[in-house]
């Protein structure tokens, strides 16, 4: 591991901490900007890096978990189907996706002044979202389905909605619920309709429709499916790191994780004269799972894919990868054609193309159903 100035003392202290003992400092944070590239910063410096477009893990107090994650990764070997197996069922479910539901949820979700993870707004928005998830569960009558908050050292909780299957083999669908205005992180207006309100409503609607399937609702799928709504992504993948660190500690058998972060902006693509596409991220992901994701898009979406890279620590799939779990990431476009309004007051619902969100809903539903019923994982 390569250390930048002033890191050695703090890293030595961090390595002595027990896994999960995330001692925080108001003054200094340890950021991982790339494999083996770490830097100690103040909070102001942390946000300055984000404003420069730098992405990172905040690994303050987490150093001792990295070796365990590496060991876990070496043991994982998952074989995914080479074609879709449930086309008729999934196509019927896709017909139940309701584009109006995206806007119905996203409008009030983006009306919170912000969803900053350290703020009361972040806490309240998480509680509001949990209520919406519970409404879906209650209306479905599904057996044993739950939504639970996952607590962190900051006020906002992540949320985990679980659909039990016949085994503990688990498929995870993720999006992040927090928001930030990088000009004023704690106080600034940050509707974040696209980043990542669009991802939240994408997987929420897929969750609703998945529960209309009788076998899924009865717990008869071979594998368990979880929908994760991560807190603190903008602060350095904080919520997802906590979750996947705990899953590693508990030897949770996660067979696949798909992240949906920004699913609604298409103007950058079309203005560039390019076809509307699903961006498939190819760095810091599992190659085999990414190939399977492309199979899903080809089968269940009506637009093509485009390969792209997003850099180190760019969204919560990177936390799954870090802790040894196979992950993939579907994005609204190729990087560079994505929304220019993120992290500002201008990331509003008016910038979101709900037809494109629907395409992401189709792939989410197909991904979840095909892997929920995959016996060979």
UniProtKB/Swiss-Prot annotation:
Annotated GO biological process: proteolysis
Gene Ontology terms, MF aspect: aminopeptidase activity; metal ion binding; metalloexopeptidase activity
Keywords: Aminopeptidase, Disulfide bond, Glycoprotein, Hydrolase, Metal-binding, Protease, Secreted, Signal, Zinc, Zymogen
pH dependence: Optimum pH is 7.1-10.
Co-factor note (free text): Binds 2 Zn(2+) ions per subunit.
One cellular-component annotation, GO: extracellular region
Activation/inhibition comment: Activity is strongly inhibited by metalchelating agents, such as EDTA and dipicolinic acid.
Binding site for Zn(2+) 1: 176, 195, 261
Cofactor: Zn(2+)
Annotated Zn(2+) 2 binding sites: 195, 234, 343
Subcellular localization, as worded in the UniProt entry: Secreted
Assembly and binders: Monomer.
Function as written in the Swiss-Prot or TrEMBL entry: Extracellular aminopeptidase that allows assimilation of proteinaceous substrates.
Name of this protein: Leucine aminopeptidase 1
Taxonomic classification: Eukaryota, Fungi, Dikarya, Ascomycota, Pezizomycotina
Gene this chain is encoded by: lap1
């Amino acid at each position: 591991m390569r250390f930048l100035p002033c890191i050695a003392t703090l890293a030595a202290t961090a390595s002595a901490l027990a896994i999960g003992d995330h001692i925080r400092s108001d003054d200094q944070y340890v950021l991982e900007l790339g494999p083996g590239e770490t830097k100690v910063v103040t909070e102001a410096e942390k946000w300055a890096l984000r404003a420069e477009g730098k992405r990172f893990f905040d690994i303050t107090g987490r150093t001792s978990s990295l070796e365990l994650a590496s060991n876990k990764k070496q043991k994982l070997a998952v074989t995914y189907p080479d074609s879709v197996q449930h086309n008729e069922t999934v196509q019927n479910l896709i017909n139940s996706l309701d584009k109006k539901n995206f806007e119905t949820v996203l409008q009030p979700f983006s009306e919170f002044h912000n969803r900053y993870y350290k703020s009361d707004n972040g806490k309240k928005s998480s509680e509001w979202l949990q209520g919406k998830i519970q409404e879906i569960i209650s209306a479905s009558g599904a057996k044993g389905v739950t939504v639970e908050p996952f607590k962190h050292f900051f006020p906002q909780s992540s949320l985990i909605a679980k659909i039990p299957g016949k085994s503990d083999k688990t498929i995870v669908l993720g999006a992040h619920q927090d928001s930030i205005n990088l000009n004023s992180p704690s106080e600034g207006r940050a509707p974040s309709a696209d980043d990542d309100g669009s991802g939240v409503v994408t997987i929420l609607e897929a969750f609703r429709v998945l529960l209309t399937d009788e076998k899924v609702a009865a717990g008869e799928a071979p594998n368990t499916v979880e929908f994760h709504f991560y807190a603190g992504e903008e602060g350095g993948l904080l919520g997802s790191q906590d979750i996947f660190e705990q899953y590693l500690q508990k030897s949770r058998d996660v067979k696949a994780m798909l992240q949906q972060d920004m699913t609604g902006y298409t103007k950058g693509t079309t203005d560039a004269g390019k076809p509307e596409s699903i961006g498939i991220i190819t760095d810091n992901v599992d190659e085999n799972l990414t190939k399977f994701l492309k199979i899903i898009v080809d089968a269940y979406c009506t637009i093509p894919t485009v390969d792209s890279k997003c850099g180190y620590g760019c969204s919560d799939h990177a936390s799954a990868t870090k802790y040894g779990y196979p992950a993939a990431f579907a994005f609204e476009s190729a990087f560079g054609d994505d929304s220019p309004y993120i992290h500002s007051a201008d990331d509003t619902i008016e910038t979101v193309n709900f037809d494109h969100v629907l395409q992401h809903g189709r792939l989410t539903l197909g991904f979840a159903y095909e892997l929920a019923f995959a016996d060979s994982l």
